[in-house]
């Protein structure tokens, strides 16, 4: 009886060992399974259609993948006009857009370098150069000598001029001299200068007035100037300009009005008075 019990116990232990061995083999099978990328379907790991806008950085600029077609473009230098308030044009020098926040936030549309919106930066689209097919000319007939093709002149690539601060052109100061007015002719646009012409009487009266008031118009002479302008028909501004222009020429030269004849010398005393004075 004891021998049979021992055999039964041995059989049970062997069965338990076999079960443990099978469980270990199952664990090894789990570890030896293919990686997750092989188990999952390919459509779940790779997406060929992108909706919306995604951004990727690095590689010479901030790249944005837009739309389902996969068009990619980068945002380069900032083109915002910083001198628009003064009527000029100047940029801040930011050469590349760098987002100031995480994608999906408002700060992602703001540049961390210059603080401007992303729309102010130049959007650079990828350029794909497609070389046109080269058509070879047909071979020349026998006995025909072909001259070499002339070297075609290729103009140098146009270089964009540097950005400069464009200020509004200064307004041309108008001459306050009404004697020298200019008017454009109707056809050719050539300006012809007109000078105010004075009569001889007006010149004499202006010269006399100038010597009287000292070649300057002062406040105490307002009544005299106003009466003179009414009598002669010369505007006040024209008279003022005439005094300024002729002060150094006519003011120094002796006036013809002052060329008075010298008074005659006194007559000589008669000898009659001298004889009376003598004792």
From Swiss-Prot:
Kindly give the Gene3D superfamilies that the UniProt entry links to this protein.
Homeodomain-like
- Single GO MF annotation: protein homodimerization activity
SUPFAM superfamilies for this protein: Homeodomain-like (SSF46689)
Supply the InterPro entries for this chain: Homeodomain-like_sf, Homeodomain_ZF_HD, ZF_HD_homeobox_Cys/His_dimer, Znf_C2H2_type
Q: Where are the zinc fingers (ZF-HD dimerization-type)?
A: 75-124
Q: Where is this region: Disordered?
A: 1-62, 128-199, 245-279
Please list the residue ranges that the record marks as compositionally biased, kind Acidic residues.
1-30
Known DNA-binding region? 191-254
The feature of type site (Required for DNA-binding) is located at 243
Q: Name one GO cellular component term.
A: nucleus
* Keyword Transcription among UniProt keywords: yes
Give me the stretches of Pro residues compositional bias. 134-143
Question: What is an example of a Pfam family matching this protein?
Answer: ZF-HD_dimer
Give me any GO biological process, just one. Answer: regulation of DNA-templated transcription
Q: Whom does it interact with, and what assembly results?
A: Homo- and heterodimer with other ZFHD proteins. Interacts with MIF1 and MIF2; these interactions prevent nuclear localization and DNA-binding to inhibit transcription regulation activity. Binds to ZHD2, ZHD3, ZHD4, ZHD5, ZHD6, ZHD7, ZHD8, ZHD9, ZHD10 and ZHD11.
What is the protein name given in its UniProt record?
Zinc-finger homeodomain protein 1
- Print the organism lineage: Eukaryota, Viridiplantae, Streptophyta, Embryophyta, Tracheophyta
**Gene of origin?**
ZHD1
